[in-house]
């Protein structure tokens, strides 16, 4: 599928030329991880210093809530790990790792969820979030909303509060944002599912 199927949402906050440059780095891979899925790969952004700079600037410019309204950033494995810590460092915030099951040392708490192509489970360490801590959840993609909803449930279980969500990409037509309880959401670009 051509890159022309990607529309720019909040990327215009960094300028049209930079936004188009960033979109040009996103690869569309049909049939991965299974037939009928078009995988949107933005890993090439991280190999490109200009692309990475634009990505971080755009994410910060498009925050769904002011930085004063959250204390830390939770990144969802795996691509949320690639930009979440850099964004947190830019903003003077801590970073929380939301990992796939079995990847963290005990004690952990987990939540199962459905993906657009299967099911999975995520975990956090039970002391990763302090009572009353306000958390911004970030990830590369919102599709069905299952991963972000599971992360929300985990943060709630350990006494934190989700302030909002920031995504690089949003798949249209899958209604994932509807699962996020009406909390503020931003995405940089959108594309058909």
Curated annotation (Swiss-Prot):
Cellular component aspect of the GO annotation: cytoplasm
Associated pathway: Purine metabolism; AMP biosynthesis via salvage pathway; AMP from adenine: step 1/1
Keywords (A to Z) from UniProt: Cytoplasm, Glycosyltransferase, Purine salvage, Transferase
Catalytic reactions of this protein: AMP + diphosphate = 5-phospho-alpha-D-ribose 1-diphosphate + adenine
Localization (cell): Cytoplasm
Xref: Gene3D superfamilies: 3.40.50.2020
Highest taxon above the source species: Bacteria
One function term, GO molecular function aspect: adenine phosphoribosyltransferase activity
Main location: cytoplasm
EC number, UniProt record: 2.4.2.7
InterPro entries reported for this sequence: Ade_phspho_trans (IPR005764), PRibTrfase_dom (IPR000836), PRTase-like (IPR029057), UPRTase/APRTase (IPR050054)
GO BP annotations listed: adenine salvage; AMP salvage; purine ribonucleoside salvage
Claim: Transferase is one of the keywords in the record: yes
PANTHER family noted in UniProt: ADENINE PHOSPHORIBOSYLTRANSFERASE
Subunit structure: Homodimer.
Similarity comment text for this entry: Belongs to the purine/pyrimidine phosphoribosyltransferase family.
Primary role: Catalyzes a salvage reaction resulting in the formation of AMP, that is energically less costly than de novo synthesis.
Protein's name in the database: Adenine phosphoribosyltransferase
Species classification: Bacteria, Bacillati, Actinomycetota, Actinomycetes, Bifidobacteriales
């Amino acid at each position: 599928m051509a890159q022309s199927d990607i529309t720019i949402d909040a990327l215009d906050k960094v300028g049209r030329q930079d936004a188009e440059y960033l979109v040009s780095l996103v690869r569309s891979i049909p049939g991965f991880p299974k037939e009928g899925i078009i995988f949107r790969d933005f890993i090439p952004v991280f190999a490109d210093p200009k692309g990475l700079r634009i990505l971080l600037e755009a994410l910060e410019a498009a925050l769904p809530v002011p930085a004063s309204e959250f204390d830390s950033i939770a990144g969802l494995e795996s691509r949320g790990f690639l930009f979440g810590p850099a964004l947190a460092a830019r903003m003077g915030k801590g970073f929380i790792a939301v990992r796939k099951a079995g990847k963290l040392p005990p004690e952990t708490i987990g939540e199962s969820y459905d993906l657009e192509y299967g099911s999975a489970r995520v975990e956090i360490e039970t002391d990763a979030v302090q009572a009353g801590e306000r958390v911004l959840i970030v990830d590369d993609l919102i599709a069905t909303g299952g991963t972000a909803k599971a992360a929300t449930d985990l943060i709630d279980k350990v006494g934190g509060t989700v302030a909002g969500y920031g995504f690089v990409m949003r798949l249209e037509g899958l209604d994932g944002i509807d699962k996020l309880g009406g909390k503020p959401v931003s995405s940089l670009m959108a594309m058909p599912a």
